Amino acid sequence: MRTLLITALLGLLAACNTTVAPTEPPAVPPATIPMVQEETLEARQERGRYLVEIMGCNDCHSPKLMGPNGPYPDPDRLLSGHPAAQALPAVPKAALKDWALFAMGNTAAVGPWGVSFAGNITSDVTGIGSWSEEQFANAMRKGWWKGIEGSRPLLPPMPWPNFANMPDADISAIYAYLMSTKPVENVVPAPVPPDQL
């Protein structure tokens, strides 16, 4: 009788348990399901514009106008590089040894490497308009002129080593933005080696 009573009591306790083993995994709330969105070209270009601005590309690649508060990027020639027709002042020989100097518009620099000129990075064919995205990535990550393997290195002050580990998505966004810019025709002068100054 005692065994029957214990068995009945255990049966009653088991019947009172309302927890049911799930037959399906619990539903994940919609807010936690990662959504894969196809990025639009406009979104890539906007991201690229943002990156170009925060990376300071206009500092060197845009000719300047002089205003009451100093130089500012010329809105008609944004990212078009050193103006082809702009003559440089005489280069101080001391700069070739221990200095790096910028011309007033910040589009030309002189130092032990000679004189370098900021490139035209607009969508014009005299800029990067005929470059592939792969060429652009090679220039940014490997420092090759026009992104062509075996070409001359990009010269100071271009900080390409800072971009060597930039994610593909950011390189692609910058390229998409630059290819959407107003094309500005401007063939930037070739660099001048120190022995020709």
Predicted regions, residues:
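Positively charged n-region of N-terminal signal peptides that target proteins for export
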Residues: M1-L4
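Bacterial signal peptide processing site
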Residues: N17-T19
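C-terminal capping alpha-helices of c-type cytochrome domains
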Residues: S130-K146, W160-P189
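Surface-exposed aromatic
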Residues: R152-P161
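Electron-transfer interface patches adjacent to heme c in soluble/periplasmic c-type cytochromes
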Residues: R77-A137, P161-I171
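C-terminal motif of bacterial Sec signal peptides marking the signal peptidase cleavage site
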Residues: L12-A15
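Electrostatic cytochrome c docking/interface patches
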Residues: V28-E53, M66-P68
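The canonical Cys-X-X-Cys-His
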Residues: G48, I54-K64, F136, I174, ...
